[in-house]
Each structure stands twice: as structure tokens, then as C-alpha cells.
Amino acid sequence: MLYEALLGLGPDGGPRHSTALLAEVEWAAAMAGDWEAVGALAVGLGPGSFTGIRIGLSTARGLAASTGLPLRGACTLDALGRALAERTASEGGPCSLAVLDARRGELFAGLYTRAGERLWDPVVLRPEALGERLGGLGEAPLAAGSGAVRFRHELAGRGVLVPDDADPVHRVAARHICALADAEASGDGDGLAPIYLRPPDAARWRERDTSKRAE
């Protein structure tokens, strides 16, 4: 059985505190039949909140070390793309656009086929740049995720289809993280790398301070 140790996000999409996350992990393990019933750990690698990704990956590595279970990871956008593929396949719909709110007025995005295969590697860009990139598509994609909800108006202006805000397709599901991670051949948790797509705020602030001192 593959157990998802982390998505790194709370119900509101924000990072969870590590102590709360550990309590949820223990609860999930108990629901599975305790740790003896768990065959591997899966972790969402991002993109997403810097804090959430760091907490999640470090927590998952700690659990892997303490339990001896293999640790695997999956891209959060790929998991959302997989959920969208299930929707478009059942409805005979278009390609899928996974969109997460990256804050700072930007989006994390990935485009997927009806089968959930990548057409783009994950990118970070502003809504207007995403709209321009979608301009070459022959059909309007179906979009989901926190970014699709937040920038619904901008995406709709480009013909992108966005389900209602309450539609569960907007949530990254643990089962999709698990399925993607389970397909990974490697179980070396030390080799997993977070997917940030841009420098953290602290790095930008240091660069800004350095530039000011150099002036």
C-alpha cells in the first residue's frame, strides 16, 4: 500500500504546521491498519508554498528514516493534471490546464493531454503571459486548481473553461500523488528535490539588499 505522507497544504491551501501534519500522518497510518500496513511514503514536491514544500519534504524524509519505508515524490501539477485527465476522458473533453496560485500575481501552470501526459513542463508566469501562451491551442482547455479559481476572469477571457469554485477537481488529491509516486522506479528519498520554479522570497530580499549596497 502506498501512503501519502504529505501534500503540505491545509484546507485553505496554506502550509500546515509540522506538528499538525505529523498528527494527520499518524491518524492516516492508523486508518490504514498501522505502520505495518504501509508499503511506501509519497510526498508532493511542489510547486507551491516554499514553507509547505520544505515542511512536507523534511517531514516525509524524517518518517522514511524512522520507519525504514521507501520515499517517493510527485509533482503537484502533475497530480492535478491527472485529476483533470479523469474529467476530460469521461466527458470527451479538451486538453487540461493545471493552475496553482503562485502569489505575487503569478501562476504555476502545466498543460496536459486528455491522458494526463505533459504537453508543457511546469512553468511560473503571470496570467496574461499564460493567456498568450494558450493562444496557439486549437481548443479551449479545461483548467483547475487554486490559480484557476483566483484568476477565473482572466482565464475565461482566453476561452479557458473553469469548473465552479466548489468543484473537487480544484483540490490536489492524495490518491493522484500516490499513483504518480508509485510509478517512480526509485525509492531514494535523499534524491528527491523540491520543485520551486523560482527563488524563495529570502533570496530575492538578499539580492535586493546587495544591489542597494552596491549603488
Which positions does each model-derived feature cover?
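Short glycine-aspartate micro-motif
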Residues: V38-G44, G52, C95-V99
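Surface "functional belts" at beta-alpha junctions
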Residues: M1-R16, P70-R171, G189, Y196, ...
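Short, flexible loop segments at boundaries between secondary-structure elements
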Residues: D165-A183
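A general structural signal for well-ordered alpha-helical segments in protein cores
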Residues: S18-V25, A60, L77, A174-C178
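Short, hydrophobic alpha-helical segments
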Residues: A29, G138, C178-S186
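N-terminal beta-alpha supersecondary unit
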Residues: M1-P47
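DPxDG-like acidic metal-binding loop motif
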Residues: A42-G73
